[in-house]
């Protein structure tokens, strides 16, 4: 006999309660899109979830007994090095897409759910499209069958024959460009754009940044505003001075425009290797009290305030997978695999020596 909805919800609440005694869940979103079909050339990385899926996820969290925490509680966690009463969850958005206001807010406001959004300074202030979105759109709308470009010091020819090949080409260029400082990255992109012969049309509305009046509306709805650097450049590849400028300029911009201290931060990309101890010293020197990474997992009792884990949510994730990921099991599995690889490498080195 299958379990009824009440029994399922009771189980969900029991699991959430048990996890909440020793950890906090921080969810990472980028955008929320309308439910109507999107063009095949957009949302390749599935970082904009459908509005109906987002609503279902929020309703499941409510039904499982989660308490939604805001920026003030994250600050308290960082300063006290302690966890709030659980089960607790924070809803976070990176980059600053306009659909955070047009699609996410209508889901969160009636449910009285607070959120945090981490803004890329140049994106929201100057309306400069994020380079990853410019790349995605240019590759997917290119009018040439292939492209030769310098990647990692070598000339590579990328085929663009069909959607799968275009997605693979976009992924290769994106992975390479992520490791470059902003100026070098822009040089690579300009060479690539010149050879793609893509239409010079505006980017789809999905990629539009928040306006300042929309940001103010989010604040009035209980959202906390944090920074995500000035140009979305991975900090580990920068000198301390460059990192200080990337973080400091965005912090100064947001504080000047919003009139509040901007002490919360999210790392661009945010995976292991994308930030270092030196990066964390730069953040601390600029008054950052809490920094969120993209390393998968829940925030446990021994967390680092300047490297708090999150669980990323994407558009291809069904509710069943969402439930599993909220437990942090995927992050644990990844950590175990990484540990095994490290141990195996060490063993091979000892044998070779």
Residue ranges and their predicted role:
Residues 2-92, 99, 130-151, 155-158, ...:
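C-terminal active-site subregion of NodB/CE4 polysaccharide deacetylases
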Residues 27, 60, 84-85, 97, ...:
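CE4/NodB-like, metal-dependent polysaccharide N-deacetylase domain
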Residues 72, 119-121:
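Glycine-rich, histidine-containing beta strand-loop boundary motifs that form or position
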Residues 93, 201-205:
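Short, flexible loop segments at the rims of nucleotide/cofactor-binding pockets, characterized by
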Residues 121-124, 297:
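Short beta-alpha junction loops
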Residues 127, 131-199:
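Conserved phosphoryl-transfer catalytic core
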Residues 206-216:
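Short, acidic loop-to-helix structural element flanking the phosphoryl-transfer center
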């Amino acid at each position: 006999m299958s379990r009824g909805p009440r029994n399922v919800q009771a189980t969900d609440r029991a699991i959430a309660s048990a996890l909440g005694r020793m950890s906090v869940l921080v969810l990472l979103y980028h955008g929320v899109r309308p439910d109507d079909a999107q063009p095949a050339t957009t949302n390749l990385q599935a970082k904009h979830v459908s509005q109906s899926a987002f609503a279902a996820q929020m309703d499941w969290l409510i039904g499982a007994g989660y308490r939604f925490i805001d920026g003030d509680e994250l600050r308290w966690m960082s300063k006290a090095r302690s966890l709030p009463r659980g089960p607790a969850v924070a809803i976070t958005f990176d980059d600053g897409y306009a659909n955070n206001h047009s699609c996410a807010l209508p889901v969160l406001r009636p449910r009285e759910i607070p959120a945090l959004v981490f803004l890329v300074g140049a994106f929201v202030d100057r309306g400069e499209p994020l380079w990853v979105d410019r790349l995605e759109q240019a590759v997917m709308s290119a009018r040439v069958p292939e492209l030769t470009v310098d990647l990692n010091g070598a000339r590579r020819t990328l085929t663009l024959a069909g959607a799968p090949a275009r997605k693979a080409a976009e992924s290769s260029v994106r992975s390479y460009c992520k490791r470059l400082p902003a100026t070098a990255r822009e040089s690579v992109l300009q060479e690539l754009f010149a050879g793609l012969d893509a239409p010079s049309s505006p980017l789809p509305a999905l990629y539009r940044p928040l306006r300042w009046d929309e940001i103010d509306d989010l604040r009035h709805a209980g959202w906390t505003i944090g920074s995500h650097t000035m140009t979305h450049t991975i900090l580990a590849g920068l000198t301390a001075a460059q990192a200080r400028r990337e973080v400091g300029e965005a912090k100064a911009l947001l504080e000047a425009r919003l009139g509040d201290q901007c002490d919360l931060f999210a790392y661009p990309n945010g995976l292991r290797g994308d930030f270092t101890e030196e990066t964390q010293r730069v953040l601390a020197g600029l008054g950052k009290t809490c920094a969120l990474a993209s390393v998968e997992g829940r925030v446990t009792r021994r967390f680092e305030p300047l490297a708090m884990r999150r669980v990323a949510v994407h558009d291809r994730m069904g509710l069943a997978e969402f439930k599993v990921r909220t437990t942090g099991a995927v992050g644990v599995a990844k950590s175990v695999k990484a540990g095994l690889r490290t141990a195996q490498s060490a063993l091979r080195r000892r044998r070779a020596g």
